[in-house]
Amino acid sequence: MTNIRKTHPLLKIINSSFVDLPAPSSLSSWWNFGSLLGVCLGVQILTGLFLAMHYTSDTATAFNSVTHICRDVNYGWLLRYLHANGASMFFICLYLHVGRGLYYGSYTYSETWNIGILLLFAVMATAFMGYVLPWGQMSFWGATVITNLLSAIPYIGTDLVQWIWGGFSVDKATLTRFFAFHFLLPFIVTALVMVHLPFLHETGSNNPTGIPSDPDMIHSHPYYTIKDILGFLVMLTALASLVLFSPDLLGDPDNYIPANPLITPPHIKPEWYFLFAYAILRSIPNKLGGVLALVMSILILAIVPILHMSKQRSMMFRPLSQCLFWLLVAVLFTLTWIGGQPVEHPYIIIGQTASTLYFLIILFLMPMISLVENYLLKW
């Protein structure tokens, strides 16, 4: 008799996606981040749902409702900090997942890669709108500064900004719509994930060597499910440690001051996971140029498959490309640091140098080094 998981209309979809899915036998821990992102998304949706039951999206009461959640709701403080720090874990896993894709050449699965870029944009939009909801100083001024960037778009810019604001400044209408979109977007992200996975399963997973592994496949369950569970435990331990020992480590103290349109904070900055893009934005003196550079800092991932010049897929056997990759990682850390610093010497020139290097490495140096490595293969 055939097992029910192979015949039941719903169970067979789950079976083919998680149980009997053929996977390369050589997958390292870098392949854990997809499942970790799934757990992060689940944690965020659940904690967010319970927070939404107590939150009020009104400028007069939003800040107080967050205080009420932390002080008066049973385990409200835990929900709030799990949600805030869960976002940080989400982005750590996201950036490591993208970095894995770049290092091992997973971007050659173009459909999966492009849907992944859409997912990245959707998660970034969700996180930005979520940062506005507590209605602290950094929430208000962050929303004002970032939405104002759209005014750099020629002809329609000013009208577009006022349309998003729902008035002539960030106010009650803005907060209400941001809450609505912040609630809606995670479900759109979930839908995109459900498109991301079938495209991946259509081609099968890449592996660290970058060599086709069709003759050497194993079942996902139990081999990789056990490995994923270990990943869950490590990540959830890290998240629990952050939430219980230092919940405000990654937040901004200014967000504990209620939003005041009459007092500008001395240094407006987004959450840490956007600082690299914020540094690229600030490094260009022209407003429209800065906005274009900001968008391109993420959108550049879409042209990475076109720039792949190497005869080998993975960087595992390409030491010169490896050096460039880790230089790129160092540049991103530098940009993250610069994004959190005031706009003054020497931070301005460091930011401009790092921004130039970021685009230079991806657009020119990586393809050139790949061609050099191709030539060296002949020796």
From Swiss-Prot:
This is Cytochrome b. It comes from the Eukaryota. A ubiquinone binds at residue 201. Heme b b566 binds at residues 97, 196. The lineage of its organism: Eukaryota, Metazoa, Chordata, Craniata, Vertebrata. PROSITE patterns: CYTB_CTER, CYTB_NTER. Belongs to the cytochrome b family. Binds 2 heme b groups non-covalently. Changing residue 267 to Y: In strain: Isolate TK 17308. It comes from Artibeus obscurus. PANTHER family: CYTOCHROME B.
